[in-house]
A protein has these predicted regions:
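Conserved glycine-rich cofactor-binding loop
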Residues: 12-13
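Conserved glycine-rich Rossmann-like NAD(P)H-binding loop of the short-chain dehydrogenase/reductase
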Residues: 26-43
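The beta1-alpha1 cofactor-binding region of Rossmann-like NAD(H)/NADP(H)-dependent oxidoreductases
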Residues: 56-66, 98
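Substrate-binding pocket helix/loop in short-chain dehydrogenase/reductase
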Residues: 92-93, 100-105
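Active-site helix of classical SDR
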Residues: 116, 153
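Residue(s) in the substrate-gating loop at a strand-loop-helix junction
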Residues: 136
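C-terminal helical subdomain
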Residues: 179, 197-235
Length: 255
């Protein structure tokens, strides 16, 4: 795979950090973004010299614009933009407070919208590019009630992603739009969720390195939808059949 310039938000830990390290080993140039300066610097250090680390609050448009502009100033182009930043919460519907609602919507949804709004105009001018939005299996199958508002925010990410795909399909066919749907992943994401992470029915967690490896392949060979866990893809299909008597439409029926 030829060297690409890749922006990754939420790069200070979890999937973002693992993805960054794998891409760096393959010779790509990275622009890494997160709020936590110390942790972000440590990830950038593990990636080796020549990469860019930009302390970024993804819930602020001006920060996302600054991330884009700093990347273009350093590398002169952007090939791939990965909207990875996110935060979990463990609250049932009737337990969610206004502050928690705002936090989860801002980090999981607003940040994705801002990322799309700052990079897609550049991709359109350039005539090509690849946008990768991180969602969740729970956006398709709301399997656990205590992930209520998190699942809802990620469902909205799916809708935004598909709407953008429709907007660009005919006018800009060389701009790839990908949606990634992880199931459970062995990271600190659940531990750091607001309210912790209660025990309950769940898929066996995937190793974060496995998920990152699948995303590296997605960047090499773009496709509309990636379920990182085949079991979650099958459960999603079964959910649609059981609930609606039909298979999921469009890209959601793709592995």
């Amino acid at each position: 795979m030829e060297s690409k310039v890749i922006v990754i938000t939420g790069a200070s830990s979890g999937i973002g950090a693992a993805l960054a390290e794998k891409l760096a080993r393959k010779g790509h140039r990275l622009s890494l973004a997160a709020r936590r300066e110390k942790e972000l610097g440590e990830v950038a250090g593990r990636c080796g010299p020549g990469h860019l680390a930009v302390v970024t609050d993804v819930t602020k448009m001006e920060d996302m614009q600054r991330l884009r502009d700093a990347t273009l100033e350093r590398f002169d182009r952007i090939d791939v933009w990965v909207n990875n930043a996110g935060r979990g919460i463990s609250r049932k519907v009737l337990e969610v407070t206004d502050c928690e609602f705002d936090e989860i919507i801002n980090v999981n949804l607003r940040s994705v919208l801002y990322g799309m709004q700052v990079i897609i105009p550049y991709f359109r001018r350039r005539g090509r590019g690849h946008l990768v939005n991180l969602s969740s299996y729970l956006s398709i199958v709301p399997q656990v009630s205590y992930r209520s508002i998190y699942s809802a925010a990620k469902s909205a990410v799916n809708s935004l992603t598909e709407s953008l795909r429709i907007d660009l399909r005919d006018s800009h066919p060389d701009i790839a739009i990908s949606l990634v749907l992880p199931g459970g992943v062995s990271t600190d994401f659940a531990k750091n969720a607001l309210g912790g992470s209660p025990r309950g029915p769940w898929l066996k967690p995937q190793d974060v390195q496995e998920v990152a490896g699948l995303m590296v392949d997605l960047i090499r060979h773009p496709r509309p939808v990636l379920f990182t866990d085949p079991a979650s893809a099958e459960l999603a299909r079964a959910y649609f059949v059981d609930s609606y008597g039909k298979k999921p439409a469009g890209g959601f029926d793709q592995k």
